[in-house]
Amino acid sequence: MSVTLPRILVNLWTQDRSISVLDCAAQMSFFLILGATECFLLAVMAYDRCVAICGPLHCPLVMTPKVCLQLAVGSWVSGIPVQTGKTCWIFSLHFCHLNETNHFFCDNPPILKLACGDTFAHAPSVCVAVLLVAAVPFILILASYSKIVCTILRLPTARRAKAFSTYSSHLLVVLLFFGSATITYLRPKSSYSAGTNRLFSLLYTIVTPMFNPMIYNLQNKDVIAALIKLLLKKVV
């Protein structure tokens, strides 16, 4: 959202929907890098919850400030070489004379449609990039939650609800992020159209990130109390 929304607002304000090739490449690069960063950060957060639930006594020893900093920095820089290389490859293609895309930001599928010739030969490099920045973090998240579920099932019934509340918000964010990304980029080609592409991209880039703060804040008792108080005032 921090990459796509500012440009959308500028376009709406100026009514100028053109963008230079350099700006388009920069927007795509930052969009891909920040997307990869979120994947790795979600994997790190899943690991943090796994340590907190499966080994609460060892959590302060495992998740030290130094380790947390290293994991955070690693999440930020891991996607840079892969996604920068992917962007350079896309913009090194030969593009046809058509330079108009029916989309509201520079995303991979609409830009690749402008390329002349067959881009299928470069599919393996794209698959490797997706595997590194999306599939690997998702597998790590599944592994963390598998261990969490196995641990919770061994807990007494009274403690299960408390343990579930520890990771429920993060699990919901993971489902929203990877679910919307899957619908946007991995749905069947027969369902592709300019209108549906824009709709799903809007869901993935703007709507889903807006829900994240709400999901995490609803785990805060003070926030819930303030929200109930506000709703009661409106009812009265």
Per-range role (PLM):
Residues 1-236:
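Transmembrane helical core of 7TM receptor-like proteins
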